[in-house]
Curated annotation (Swiss-Prot):
Alphabetic keyword roster: Chloroplast, Plastid, Ribonucleoprotein, Ribosomal protein, RNA-binding, rRNA-binding
InterPro entries associated with the record: Ribosomal_uS11 (IPR001971), Ribosomal_uS11_CS (IPR018102), Ribosomal_uS11_sf (IPR036967)
Subcellular location, record wording: Plastid, Chloroplast
Keyword Chloroplast: yes
Principal localisation: plastid
The keyword Plastid is assigned to this record: yes
Protein name: Small ribosomal subunit protein uS11c
Gene for this chain: rps11
GO cellular component, one term: chloroplast
Amino acid sequence: MTKAIPKIGSRKKVRIGLRRNARFSLRKSARRITKGIIHVQASFNNTIITVTDPQGRVVFWSSAGTCGFKSSRKASPYAGQRTAVDAIRTVGLQRAEVMVKGAGSGRDAALRAIAKSGVRLSCIRDVTPMPHNGCRPPKKRRL
C-alpha cells in the first residue's frame, strides 16, 4: 500500500536536510580570470563589490553582509576593505578597471584595498549618478 501524502495544513513537520550556515556551501566556485572590471557600489548601509569580465558578465560578487558583517558594521570602512580583498582573492585578477558608485564610507577603503592587492589598474572611474536637478531629495533628518 502507498503512503498517504501529508496535507498542507497538517501538523507534522518535514525537516529539510540543510544546515543553518548552508549559504557558504551552496556558492559556486568563481571562474579565474586575468583581466576584468571591478564595480564598487558603496551605499550608506553596505558595500557591494562585483567582478565582471571585460564583456560585462558577472564572475563573482561580494558584499559586507556575505563577509560576515551584520547591521551597522556593514557600513564601516573595514567592512568595505574586507569585501574588496575577498572578491579579488577569489577571482585572481591581474589587470582591472575600477568603477566606483556611491558615497558610502566603504568606498575609499575598498579602493585602497584594491590598489594594495597587486592588481594593475588601468583606470578608475566614478560613475555615481548625479541628477541635473531632477527629483526632489528626501528631507533632512532631525535627531
